């Protein structure tokens, strides 16, 4: 799971919010620690894995909204990794941007047909950014940092 490596290789610091393992073996979010770290460490961007990989936790609507509200309150951009959304067997996957209109201003949603359709070798994904300002910044970074585009996305 390369989140930490990607963060550090881009000159940023990791503020890890470790999941709480409950007695029944399930996992929960430590919301107090999550918000405390945002405030104390000046977090600007939150990488949210939903459903969680590798623990396969499907977050409830209330949990997702609580995270979203904390991020709204502190002006934190959310990168919502929803690449495993098609593999939910129990519960319902909660799409962050569908829960509240305000979340669209701070959310970058990542999806991919790779896992669902066994196409991981293509190394493609969908990046959905409703906010025009965020989208423009992202497009600029793609051009500056990657300097290469997949032939299938050139038209996009």
Give the residues covered by each predicted segment.
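Active-site phosphate-binding strand-loop segment of PLP-dependent enzymes
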Residues: 19-91
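Conserved core segment of the aminotransferase class I/II
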Residues: 9, 101-156
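Hydrophobic/aromatic ligand-binding patch that stacks against planar heteroaromatic rings
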Residues: 5-7, 70, 99
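Substrate-binding/gating loop at the entrance of the active-site cleft, primarily
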Residues: 1-14, 149
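Short, glycine/charged-enriched secondary-structure capping and boundary segments
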Residues: 7-12, 30-31, 60-63, 91-95, ...
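Aromatic/hydrophobic pocket-lining residues that form π-stacking "cages" and hydrophobic walls in ligand
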Residues: 3, 67, 96
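A short helix->loop->beta-strand "cap" motif at the edges of active sites that frequently abuts
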Residues: 12, 73-77, 104-105
